[in-house]
């Protein structure tokens, strides 16, 4: 084998390695997102939030059907999504933008990892209410291809800012630092909603250690805490009603809550 052939072979191996590797996405931030906003914070102190790990729209029957996901989330004013499929060479639009177009919502897609320079997968927020600004923070350590992050969305209500946080974390047994970082961010905002898939139940010791003392689990009466890993956590807001939809369109249930702003959060 000549040196040229060896170099060619090594370049092929390197290219295959890079093509198959998932890379984390850097921290990002942005300004207002108002396109398709159909509600105003001036009209009401009550709004509905939801959280849904959509499993790339693959249901328990093995079929991928984004229309089923849209039907589940269509009544939410703000919905946080996890495991959202991004773009690729043969898939020019991510699932979040397709859902936003179907439901006529504001949308932000926060990819958590890239594959061959394409945003392969991530989290997203769809909203009827305008978003004032946003930022996304990667969290470490990550394991394998499961790169993680959380996003913070500031929304300007007539009673002050409301912050919506969305995340998808690995199990605390794989490292508590990501969970700690998310909870520290949550604790900074007096009026905030933390949504997402934590891969841990609310009675997990790590969750108990890092959850702010004044936070409430809006879903505590909806499904036994021993099973549920999807959360709607509140600070400075009150849940007037909560409900869920069973797994089927995804391998996760959908959870939602109707919230009222506390005019003077502590």
Regions found by a protein language model. Name each.
Residues 1-74, 78, 86, 90, ...:
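Active-site regions of metal-assisted phosphoester/phosphodiester hydrolases
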Residues 94:
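Short, surface-exposed acidic-centric catalytic microdomains
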């Amino acid at each position: 084998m000549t040196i040229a052939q060896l170099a060619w072979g090594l370049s092929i191996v390197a290219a295959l390695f890079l093509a198959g590797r998932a890379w984390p996405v850097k921290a990002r931030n942005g300004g207002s997102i108002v396109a398709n906003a159909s509600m105003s914070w001036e009209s009401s102190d009550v709004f509905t939030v939801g959280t849904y790990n959509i499993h790339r729209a693959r249901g328990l029957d093995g079929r991928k059907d984004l229309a089923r996901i849209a039907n589940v989330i269509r009544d939410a004013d703000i919905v946080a999504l996890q495991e959202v499929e991004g773009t690729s060479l043969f898939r020019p639009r991510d699932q979040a933008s397709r859902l936003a177009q179907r439901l006529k919502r504001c949308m932000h897609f926060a990819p958590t990892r890239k594959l061959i320079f394409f945003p392969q997968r991530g989290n997203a927020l769809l909203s009827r209410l305008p978003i004032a600004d946003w930022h996304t923070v990667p969290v470490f350590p990550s394991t394998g291809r499961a790169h993680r992050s959380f996003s913070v969305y500031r929304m300007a209500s007539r009673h002050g800012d409301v912050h919506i946080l969305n995340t998808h974390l690995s199990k605390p047994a794989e490292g508590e630092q990501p969970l700690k970082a998310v909870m520290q961010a949550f604790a900074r905002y007096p009026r905030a909603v933390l949504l997402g898939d934590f891969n841990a139940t609310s009675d997990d010791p790590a969750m108990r250690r890092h959850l702010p003392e004044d936070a409430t689990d809006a879903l505590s009466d909806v499904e036994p805490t021993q099973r549920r890993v999807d959360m709607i956590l509140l600070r400075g807001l009150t849940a007037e009603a909560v409900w869920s939809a069973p797994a089927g369109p995804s391998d996760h249930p959908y959870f939602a809550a109707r919230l009222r702003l506390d005019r003077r959060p502590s």
